[in-house]
C-alpha cells in the first residue's frame, strides 16, 4: 500500500510471490487488486511460471481488467496453509519495520513474541542492528518503488555489481538490479 498509494506511483500490475502465498494465501492480494484497480498474478519461480504469469498480467492490462489470478495453483490456495499460519501466529507478532526505499511503516513486519525470547537472537545477544545507508549515487530506493530502472543508475554495472553491490536490489539474485545485470543485452542486441 505504501508503494501503490504513493504520489507518482507508476506500478500497473504485480507478480505476487508464490512462496509467500503458499503459506499465507492470496486474500490480501485480492484486496489490493480491488483497492488499487491493478491486476495481480501469483507466480512460482520456475522460468515457465514467470513467463505464464507475465502473459496473464499483460492480458489483463490489454483487456482493461484488474483482478487477482493464481498461476501457481499447484502450490497456492486462497487460504494458504492453515497449519503454517497458526504456527507463524504463535511465534510472531506484527511490528513496525523500516523498509528500504520506503521508510518506517507501522505494523508492516514481524518480530518474535516475548514468549520466544529464549530463542530470539536479538534478545539473547542484545544485538542492535544499525541501519546502513546506501551511497548517495545508489538509486535502489527508486528501483524498489518502480520509479527507475536499474540501468538508470550511474553506478550500475561499474561500481555496483553482484560481487560489489551498493544496494539491496543488487545483493539478492531475485533483485531487479541483479536480474538486469545477469540478463542485460548490449545496445547491438548481443549479450553484454
Report each predicted region and the residues it spans:
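A conserved active-site cap/scaffold subdomain adjacent to cofactor or substrate pockets
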Residues: 9-77
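Catalytic phosphate/nucleotide-handling subdomain of diverse soluble enzymes
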Residues: 186-192
Amino acid at each position: 500500500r505504501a508503494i501503490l498509494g504513493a504520489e507518482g506511483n507508476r506500478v500497473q500490475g504485480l507478480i505476487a510471490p508464490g512462496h509467500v502465498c503458499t503459506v499465507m494465501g492470496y486474500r490480501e492480494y485480492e484486496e489490493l487488486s480491488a483497492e488499487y484497480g491493478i491486476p495481480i498474478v501469483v507466480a512460482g519461480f520456475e522460468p515457465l511460471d514467470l513467463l505464464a504469469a507475465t502473459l496473464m498480467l499483460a492480458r489483463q492490462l490489454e483487456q482493461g481488467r484488474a483482478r487477482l489470478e493464481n498461476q501457481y495453483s499447484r502450490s497456492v490456495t486462497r487460504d494458504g496453509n492453515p497449519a503454517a499460519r497458526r504456527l507463524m501466529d504463535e511465534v510472531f507478532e506484527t511490528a513496525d519495520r523500516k523498509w528500504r526505499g520506503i521508510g518506517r511503516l507501522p505494523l508492516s513486519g514481524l518480530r518474535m513474541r516475548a514468549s520466544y525470547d529464549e530463542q530470539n537472537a536479538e534478545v539473547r545477544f542484545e544485538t542492535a542492528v544499525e541501519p546502513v545507508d546506501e551511497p548517495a549515487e545508489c538509486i535502489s530506493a527508486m528501483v524498489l518503488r518502480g520509479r527507475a530502472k536499474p540501468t538508470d543508475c550511474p553506478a550500475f554495472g561499474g561500481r555496483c555489481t553482484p560481487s560489489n553491490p551498493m544496494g539491496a536490489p543488487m545483493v539478492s539474485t531475485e533483485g531487479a538490479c541483479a536480474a538486469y545485470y545477469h540478463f542485460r543485452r548490449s545496445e547491438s542486441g548481443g549479450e553484454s
